[in-house]
Curated annotation (Swiss-Prot):
NCBIfam families (UniProt xref): RNasePH (TIGR01966)
Name this protein carries in UniProt: Ribonuclease PH
Database matches in Gene3D superfamilies: GHMP Kinase, N-terminal domain (3.30.230.70)
Pfam family, one: RNase_PH
Protein's job: Phosphorolytic 3'-5' exoribonuclease that plays an important role in tRNA 3'-end maturation. Removes nucleotide residues following the 3'-CCA terminus of tRNAs; can also add nucleotides to the ends of RNA molecules by using nucleoside diphosphates as substrates, but this may not be physiologically important. Probably plays a role in initiation of 16S rRNA degradation (leading to ribosome degradation) during starvation.
UniProt record similarity statement: Belongs to the RNase PH family.
Transferase as UniProt keyword: yes
GO function terms (MF aspect): 3'-5'-RNA exonuclease activity; tRNA binding; tRNA nucleotidyltransferase activity
GO biological process per UniProt: rRNA catabolic process; rRNA processing; tRNA processing
Protein species of origin: Nitrosospira multiformis (strain ATCC 25196 / NCIMB 11849 / C 71)
Length: 238
């Protein structure tokens, strides 16, 4: 039995609230169980130097955690004067995931800046950030379309992410913090709505996992991502 009492193939409850903040072109609060993240997408009318004059846009992401988003207060990274390797890894993952469903040539020479700020953490913050940020980006693109700043949407499909793992020998979907801290294997999967794999990050924390375990985890992730994309579509239709 999982500590959360969920079935091995059961997601935590998911709630996506759009237009959560006033100023950003796209903003979302995503709640996955007790994990809560504010995702915003802002439009910047310029591109990085390496893209100037090339007629295409860019999307990049930043990620951070509030000091008391966890059980014990963390020092702000700004106070330390540098980002941790974990933070840099996660924000690059978010950017790659979102760019996988963008035709940046349709964006023009502008940048979508995504910010994912964890206000409460209970596992799965990087995967929830991707799932929520997609909706924020969708709304930011909607703003550009309404302003006639672009002629067509650059979004080519949906993308979402979920964690899977092996806990006490059983492959499981959507690990919370307690499960993640005790699992034998931890893996993050990013997929599109046509079930294309964007990224897999997996590590055996204790015993190595088998090919059969991997196949079972991929099946669980595919099921979970279908449900998460359905939640995205439901939020966008409200």
């Amino acid at each position: 039995m999982r500590p959360s009492k969920r079935r091995p193939d059961q997601l935590r409850s998911v709630q996506i609230t759009r237009h959560y903040t006033r100023h950003a072109e796209g903003s979302v609060l995503i709640e996955c169980g007790d994990t809560r993240i504010i995702c915003t997408a802002s439009v910047d009318e310029k591109v990085p130097l390496f893209l100037r004059g090339k007629g295409q846009g860019w999307l990049t992401a930043e990620y951070g955690m509030l000091p008391r988003s966890t059980n014990e207060r963390m020092q702000r990274e700004a106070a330390k004067g540098k980002q941790s390797g974990r933070t840099m890894e996660i924000q690059r993952l978010i950017g790659r995931a979102l760019r996988s469903v963008m035709d940046l040539t349709k964006l023009g020479e502008r940048t979508i800046q995504v910010d994912c700020d964890v206000i409460q953490a209970d596992g799965g913050t990087r995967t929830a950030s991707i799932t929520g940020a997609f909706v924020a980006v969708h709304d930011a693109i909607g703003t550009l379309l309404r302003k006639q700043a672009i002629e067509a949407t650059p979004i080519t499909g949906h993308v979402a992410a979920v964690s899977v793992g092996v806990y006490e020998g059983v492959p499981m979907l959507d690990l919370d913090y307690l499960e993640d801290s005790r699992c034998d294997t931890d893996m993050n999967i990013v997929m599109t709505d046509d079930l294309g794999l964007v990224e897999m990050q997996g590590t055996a924390e204790g015993m190595p996992f088998s090919r059969n375990d991997l196949d079972m985890m991929l099946d669980l992730a595919q099921q979970g991502i279908r449900e998460l994309i359905a939640a995205q579509k439901n939020a966008l239709n409200r």
